[in-house]
């Protein structure tokens, strides 16, 4: 019985995995069965084909059951709505009014009503007819097809109102609200219609629909619809940050923006920092953004006023405190290292019993370890080390439960492996203390490990510097990405060739060929060969087996030439990918560090940033003032663009005239000059690099996307353009 139960659990897990793999096939089968059931049923077929004659005949047929359903549990009204057959749907509602409130019974469309389908198809007339005949504007479609998952291509929520908002039909939205649809309704994930709009791929109409729904948010509610959180505690604003929806984020920020004054190209604005400022919030917006799995979320850090707020906090409080913390940790590690170097040792009392035993010192027992003045000085350092380890654990452990172990240890921007390293180090220090108090031998093992891990943690403080911060992420990605994959390949190669070398030399004299005398030694020698630490560990003064030469030749080609160079290429690719986004990663590191320090530091050492609205009659909210500089005359830039067009056109014409000086080609040149009057945006390679680069700068500036660091590259040297 004890053996059978685990086998049943394993079988259930395998069946679940197979069902997940065959999800698409399962859905395909359901839709095929649906078409089959529609074809076999005269009522469903007539609803699909809008066959009014058949429906009238079935209407007078007493044996016809209008409650019959298809393979998915759908009624004839569902089928008519699915195929946009308004006449058939109206006849069915007149014949069987109860069909209006009927929903689909089978997965994956459980709970779907004809109203949901009509809204999806944006059939306004059918929606109006359904609502007029009593269709519920609050019906919920709870099937798996309406969940937010990788299996589904769309996520429209569960309520008809969210369906209408997601398809972008303002008329249907107004109809539903007039018929009692609750705009504050939440689905099984706790998402309101505003949350669902944030998740839509079409950002433009989502913003328009967002405003429309907010205009209907009235009543005596204590909290605005925008501040209603979902099951994860995310408001629509925070969800936009987590998803990296910069369009929706900017749209919401414009609603919080108040222009104070405008003077020529300068504009002074104040931004409401509600939900943005992480000061005093358990679920920080900034922390949610930097810990998001989506790369687009990091673009939020470049938006106003987030960029200005982070810069203010980092320069005023974050950077000084972080540098001070880094120096304290270095002094702490120096103290720990000194205590380890001068640990209590004495000369060994017992005689050596083996010729290979080279130990001359041993650890002192607890009674002899703290006797002299030097021992008492070391005791002070050891107490500092132990207290520091306890403080580290008290700081780290609450964050593990607050954030979650997987995100806390797995996200490189939040610190990732450094948290594992520092917690392991602190645990080893406490283990050393226990071993010292109990006079247990072998403390050299945790001491050596703690020294390595403790000094490696110093790299964590490099994130305070723009030049060094991204390199720590680069090292992490190489270790946990490239190196792990390479180690799997290396293990297979070493295992295979070590076995081959051992078999080849198994019949030889081990005194002459000690490198492959036994299997463990053969494994280690092959590992050294793989890393080119040693060269061909064989005794060439004796006859070697013929297979050794062939095997060693194959090993040298595969290991040294192929795999090591492959590993170098993999690390080079990782370096290139991280280098492309190094500035973005460093900003994310700065935000994560700022939020961490703000959460840990006492409030009197880290006051709240911004302007309190209470002092100026703006309520209990905080604001940040930002000054913008805008080009006062955009037509001046357009003139620069036209100047570059004409100069580039003349340059191309000169080059073509040099290549085609003969009179027979004049017509071709003339025709070419006509084409050159409207040069394409992608300039020809014959143009000079300075002119081409200048054109790109002006074109991007005109379109409002000027970003020299990202679009035109960095590190190419400073170039000055004279207009």
Curated annotation (Swiss-Prot):
GO terms for biological process: calcium ion homeostasis; calcium ion import across plasma membrane; calcium ion transmembrane transport; calcium ion transport; calcium ion transport into cytosol; protein homotetramerization; regulation of urine volume. Glycosylated. Residues 1-320, 402-412, 463-485, 571-723 are cytoplasmic. The keyword Ribosomal protein does not apply. Residues 517-537 dip into the membrane without crossing it. It catalyses: Ca(2+)(in) = Ca(2+)(out). The modification Phosphothreonine is found at residue 678. One of its GO terms (cellular component) is plasma membrane. GO terms for molecular function: calcium channel activity; calmodulin binding; metal ion binding. Activated by WNK3. Residues 651-674 are annotated as: Disordered. Ca(2+) binds at residue 535. Residues 654-667 have a biased composition (Polar residues). Residues 591-595 are annotated as: Interaction with S100A10. Residues 643-646, 693-723 are annotated as: Involved in Ca(2+)-dependent inactivation. Belongs to the transient receptor (TC 1.A.4) family. TrpV subfamily. TRPV5 sub-subfamily. Constitutively active calcium selective cation channel thought to be involved in Ca(2+) reabsorption in kidney and intestine. Required for normal Ca(2+) reabsorption in the kidney distal convoluted tubules. The channel is activated by low internal calcium level and the current exhibits an inward rectification. A Ca(2+)-dependent feedback regulation includes fast channel inactivation and slow current decay. Heteromeric assembly with TRPV6 seems to modify channel properties. TRPV5-TRPV6 heteromultimeric concatemers exhibit voltage-dependent gating. Homotetramer and probably heterotetramer with TRPV6. Interacts with TRPV6. Interacts with S100A10 and probably with the ANAX2-S100A10 heterotetramer. The interaction with S100A10 is required for the trafficking to the plasma membrane. Interacts with calmodulin. Interacts with BSPRY, which results in its inactivation. This is Transient receptor potential cation channel subfamily V member 5. The gene is Trpv5.
């Amino acid at each position: 019985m004890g053996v059978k139960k685990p086998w049943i659990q394993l079988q259930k897990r395998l069946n679940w995995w197979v069902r997940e793999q065959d999800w698409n096939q399962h859905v395909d089968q359901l839709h095929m069965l649906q078409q089959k059931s529609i074809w076999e049923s005269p009522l469903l077929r007539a609803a699909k084909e809008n066959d009014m004659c058949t429906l009238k005949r079935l209407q007078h047929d007493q044996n016809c059951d209008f409650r019959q359903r298809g393979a998915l549990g759908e009624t004839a009204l569902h089928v008519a709505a699915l195929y946009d057959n308004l006449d058939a749907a109206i006849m069915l509602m007149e014949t069987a009014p109860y069909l209006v409130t009927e929903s689909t019974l089978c997965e994956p469309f459980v709970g779907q009503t004809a109203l949901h389908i009509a809204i999806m198809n944006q059939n306004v007339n059918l929606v109006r007819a359904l609502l007029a005949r009593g269709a519920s504007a609050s019906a919920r479609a709870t099937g798996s097809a309406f969940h937010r998952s990788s299996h589904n291509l769309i996520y429209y929520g569960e309520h008809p109102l969210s369906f209408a908002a997601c398809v972008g039909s303002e008329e249907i939205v107004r109809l539903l609200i007039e018929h009692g649809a609750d705009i504050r309704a939440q689905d099984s994930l706790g998402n309101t219609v505003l949350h669902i709009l944030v998740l839509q791929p079409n950002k433009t109409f989502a913003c328009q629909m967002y405003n429309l729904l907010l205009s209907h948010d009235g009543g005596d509610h204590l909290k605005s619809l925008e501040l209603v959180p979902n099951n994860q505690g995310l408001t629509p604003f925070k969800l936009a940050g987590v998803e990296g929806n910069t369009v929706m984020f900017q749209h919401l920020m414009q609603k919080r923006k108040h222009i104070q004054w405008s003077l020529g190209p300068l504009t002074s604005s104040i931004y409401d920092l509600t939900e943005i400022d992480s000061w005093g919030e358990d679920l920080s917006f900034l922390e949610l953004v930097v810990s998001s799995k989506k790369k687009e979320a990091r673009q939020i850090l470049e938006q106003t006023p987030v960029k200005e707020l982070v810069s203010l906090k980092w320069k005023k409080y974050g950077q000084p405190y972080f540098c001070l913390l880094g120096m304290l940790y270095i002094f702490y590690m120096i103290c720990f290292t000194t205590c380890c170097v001068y640990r209590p040792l004495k000369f060994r009392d017992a005689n050596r019993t083996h010729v290979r035993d080279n130990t001359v010192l041993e650890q002192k027992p607890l009674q002899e370890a703290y006797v002299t003045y030097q021992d008492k000085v070391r005791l002070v350092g050891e107490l500092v080390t132990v207290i520091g380890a306890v403080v580290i654990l008290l700081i780290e452990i609450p964050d593990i439960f607050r954030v979650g172990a997987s995100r806390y240890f797995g996200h490189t921007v939040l610190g990732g492996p450094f948290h594992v390293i520092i917690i392991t180090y602190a645990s080893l220090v406490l283990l050393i203390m226990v071993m010292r108090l109990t006079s247990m031998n072998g403390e050299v093992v945790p001491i050596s490990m703690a020294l390595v891990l403790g000094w490696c943690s110093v790299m964590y403080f490099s994130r305070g510097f723009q030049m060094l911060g991204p390199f720590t992420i680069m090292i992490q990605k190489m270790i946990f990405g490239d190196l792990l994959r390479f180690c799997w390949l290396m293990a297979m190669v070493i295992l295979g060739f070590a076995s081959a070398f051992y078999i080849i030399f198994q019949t030889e004299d081990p005194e002459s060929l000690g490198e492959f005398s036994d299997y463990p030694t053969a494994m280690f020698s092959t590992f050294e060969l793989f890393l080119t630490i040693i060269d061909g560990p064989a005794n060439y003064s004796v006859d070697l087996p013929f297979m050794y030469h062939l095997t060693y030749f194959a090993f040298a080609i595969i290991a040294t030439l192929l795999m090591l160079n492959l590993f170098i290429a993999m690390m080079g690719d990782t370096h290139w990918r991280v280098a492309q986004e190094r500035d973005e990663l460093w900003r994310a590191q700065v935000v994560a560090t700022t939020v961490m320090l703000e959460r840990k530091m006492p409030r009197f050492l880290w006051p709240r940033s911004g302007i309190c609205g209470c002092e100026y009659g703006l309520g209990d909210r905080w604001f940040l003032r930002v000054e913008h500089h805008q080009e006062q005359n955009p037509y001046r830039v357009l003139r620069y663009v036209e100047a570059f067009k004409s100069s580039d056109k003349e340059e191309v014409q000169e080059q073509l005239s040099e290549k085609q000086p003969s009179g027979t080609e004049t017509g071709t040149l003339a025709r070419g000059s006509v084409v050159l009057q409207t040069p394409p945006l992608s300039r020809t390679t014959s143009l000079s690099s300075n002119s081409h680069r200048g054109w790109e700068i002006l074109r991007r500036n005109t379109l409002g996307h000027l970003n020299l660091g990202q679009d035109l590259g960095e590190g190419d040297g400073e170039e000055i353009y004279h207009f």
